[in-house]
């Protein structure tokens, strides 16, 4: 009998470890952290900073009826035109009366939803979950956003931001999937955003930035035609904003403040916003003009033009080096 052949033991094939690319755990963590940060806001009351005029003593939102809804969309109120924001207050009052908790709850809920949309948009755009995590955490937890969430009247900020990013997501889906329905949704959501706050008109140039980042030819006929309805809506609501502010004398005459001073103050606001984003200090709900009319401007305000000049040179450098990711992030 021949000797049995020794059987070579089979090597165990190590199964590759599957990476869990599901963002659900990150999303839960980000939203949980944001909720914890804003828990104190549930106890906030109505402030005499516009909350009385816009909410508790606003005669057009106390009763939910057709006449009041028509009034919200057809008239200026308190020097502004944001009917969708006032309509959301009307709905809150029907649900919880004038209890501040219901208004605070809605603000926080909208902020959470927008934080989620930012996560989705950034991941959709860059396909890198770590960038989406950082961006959504910064938005959800940064001190500069506390005013918009914790102050009832600033509902217009959290509401317009929600529709703004929802519109961006829809437009980006239109670019990737080439389906017209996403374009229609982007336009509709943009309209909802400007009906919440006029600042949403910034979406129109943001779409051009998105086109550039996605490699589209900006002078292409189709690309130009796509932007016409967005810019038309933006111009219309820009005019409405000027008219609404003029109705209460909120727009100063040209000779009230020299154009050079206006430019310097704009640069100062730009510089301080960047600085407070990096190092949030001395935050306030109200930032008055630094000097009385006719007085000279302190040197620090003239120096605030330097960050704007530096930003221009930085953008030129980024474009020259074709660092499109950084250029897009900076401009966005």
What name fits each language-model region?
Residues 2-332:
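Polytopic membrane enzymes that build or remodel cell-surface glycoconjugates and lipids
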């Amino acid at each position: 009998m021949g000797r049995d052949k020794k059987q070579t033991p089979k090597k165990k094939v190590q199964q590759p470890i599957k990476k869990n690319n599901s963002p659900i755990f990150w999303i839960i963590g980000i939203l949980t952290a944001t909720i914890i940060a804003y828990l104190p806001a549930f106890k906030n009351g109505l402030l005499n900073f516009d909350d009385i005029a816009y909410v508790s003593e606003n005669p057009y939102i106390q009763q939910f009826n057709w006449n009041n809804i028509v009034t919200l969309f057809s008239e200026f109120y308190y020097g502004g035109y944001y009917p969708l924001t006032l309509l959301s207050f009307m709905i809150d009052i029907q649900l919880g009366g004038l209890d501040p908790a219901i208004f605070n709850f809605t603000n926080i809920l909208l902020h959470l939803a927008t934080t989620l949309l930012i996560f989705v948009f950034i991941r959709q755009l860059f396909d890198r979950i770590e960038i989406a995590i950082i961006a959504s955490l910064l938005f959800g937890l940064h001190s500069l956003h506390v005013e918009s969430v914790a102050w009832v009247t600033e509902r217009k900020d959290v509401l317009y931001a929600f529709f703004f990013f929802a519109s961006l997501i829809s437009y980006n889906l239109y670019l990737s999937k080439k389906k017209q329905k996403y374009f229609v949704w982007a336009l509709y959501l943009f309209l909802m955003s400007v009906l919440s706050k006029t600042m949403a008109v910034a979406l129109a140039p943001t779409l051009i930035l998105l086109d550039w980042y996605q490699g589209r030819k900006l002078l292409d006929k189709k690309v130009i035609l796509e932007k016409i309805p967005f810019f038309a809506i933006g111009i219309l609501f820009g005019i409405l904003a000027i008219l609404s502010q003029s109705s209460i004398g909120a727009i100063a005459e040209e000779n009230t403040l020299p154009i050079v001073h206006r430019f310097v103050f704009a640069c100062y606001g730009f510089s301080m916003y960047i600085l407070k984003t990096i190092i949030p200090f001395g935050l306030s709900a109200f930032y008055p003009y630094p000097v009385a009319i006719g007085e000279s401007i302190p040197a620090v305000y003239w120096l605030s033009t330097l960050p704007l000049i530096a930003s221009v040179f930085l953008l030129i450098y980024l474009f020259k080096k074709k660092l499109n990711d950084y250029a897009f992030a900076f401009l966005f």
